[in-house]
From Swiss-Prot:
Top-level taxonomy: Bacteria, Bacillati, Bacillota, Bacilli, Bacillales
Function description: Catalyzes the reductive methylation of 2'-deoxyuridine-5'-monophosphate (dUMP) to 2'-deoxythymidine-5'-monophosphate (dTMP) while utilizing 5,10-methylenetetrahydrofolate (mTHF) as the methyl donor and reductant in the reaction, yielding dihydrofolate (DHF) as a by-product. This enzymatic reaction provides an intracellular de novo source of dTMP, an essential precursor for DNA biosynthesis.
Recorded metabolic or biological pathway in which this protein acts: Pyrimidine metabolism; dTTP biosynthesis
GO cellular component terms given for this protein: cytosol
Compartments reported by the entry: Cytoplasm
Molecular functions (GO terms): thymidylate synthase activity
Subunit structure of this chain's protein: Homodimer.
Entry binding sites for dUMP: 26, 181-182, 221-224, 232, 262-264
Protein's UniProt name: Thymidylate synthase
Top EC class for this record: transferase
């Protein structure tokens, strides 16, 4: 048996495997892809942290709080031992004139295929992380990912140099004009795509208020179904909870709309392992603080009664 959250995710995986089309991609890994899909999660029924594999709430929550703070430097993440953005910052460093270590060309693919190189890569990455944490000048130069999510959410800059806090504006709109159809935040800033370590995959989200409940719909242009989507589901569900609390509302639905929904060819075995599992009951979320969303800390958030199958490892496509 599957709970409703895991079932929706499993059905998407099965549909992509069954009818998806093979496509090449930016990373040259290869994918099975489907264009256009939608999932709906009733957040009053629990918190959609998948149970058919262990998903780290700490990584999800600290990344979301990083976005909310408007931060774009991995130093904050590393302080929580959150490594999910490391490869993009590391890539910038090893391509710079300041790097004089072993050849790191195509380190992502090489580390998967060559164990001796993988050991060298891990050592270089560990040294890089230590420098980010302990050297402010180095962190400022090589820890910053450019104008990624946090910058666009909190400090969108137009062509005239005006700065716009989208997230704060939307929260104020929800409080003062809940029936507006303009509760939208966009991370897709066409004029700044080239300044980002990775163009935003989850590009735009909209809030909807009905009967005292706040719902959120995310449009995700590019969706890594195995590694990324379980995080995205939980992240935007958490964001909905935080903003609902900020605005004195209950939670409604999280609606997840996909553009290119894909399974990487080197994730298929991992997906099949997950699909063979039964689920547990979903956990619940506690927000143990009345602080503003902009002042919430990770320690204020609590996942209750989370039971899951073991994590399943798979390589990230850089």
């Amino acid at each position: 048996m599957l709970n409703a959250f895991d079932q929706a995710y499993h059905q998407l995986c099965e549909e992509i495997l069954e009818i998806g089309k093979q496509k090449n991609d930016r990373t040259n890994t290869g994918t099975i892809s489907k264009f256009g899909h939608q999932l709906r999660f009733d957040l009053s029924k629990g918190f959609p942290l998948l149970t058919t594999k262990k998903v780290s709430f700490k990584l999800i929550a600290t990344e979301l709080l990083w976005f909310i703070k408007g931060d774009t430097n991995i130093k904050y993440l590393l302080q929580y031992n959150n490594n999910i953005w490391n490869e993009w910052a590391f890539e910038k460093f090893v391509q710079s004139k300041d790097y004089n270590g072993p050849d790191m060309t195509d380190f992502g693919h090489r580390a998967q295929k060559d164990e001796s190189f993988n050991l060298i890569y891990k050592d270089e990455m560990n040294q890089f992380k230590k420098r980010i944490l302990n050297d402010d000048d180095f962190a400022k130069k090589y820890g910053d990912l450019g104008n990624v999510y946090g910058k666009q959410w909190r400090d969108w800059e137009d062509k005239y140099g005006n700065h716009y806090d989208q997230l704060k504006t939307v929260i104020n709109q929800i409080k003062t004009n809940p029936n507006s159809r303009r509760h939208i935040v966009s991370a897709w800033n066409p004029t700044e795509i080239d300044t980002m370590a990775l163009p935003p995959c989850h590009t735009m989200f909209q809030f909807y208020v009905q009967d005292g409940k706040l719902s959120c719909q995310l449009y995700q242009r590019s969706a890594d179904i195995f590694l990324g989507v379980p995080f995205n589901i939980a992240s935007y569900s958490l964001l909905t909870h935080l903003i609902a609390k900020e605005c004195g509302l209950e939670v409604g639905e999280f609606v997840h709309t996909f553009g290119d929904a894909h399974i990487y060819s080197n994730h298929i075995e991992a997906i099949e392992t997950q699909l063979a599992r039964e689920s547990y009951n979903p956990p619940t979320l506690n927000i143990n603080s009345d602080a503003s969303i902009f002042d919430i800390d990770y320690e204020d958030l609590e996942i209750v009664d989370y039971e899951s199958h073991p994590a399943i490892k798979a390589p990230i496509a850089v």
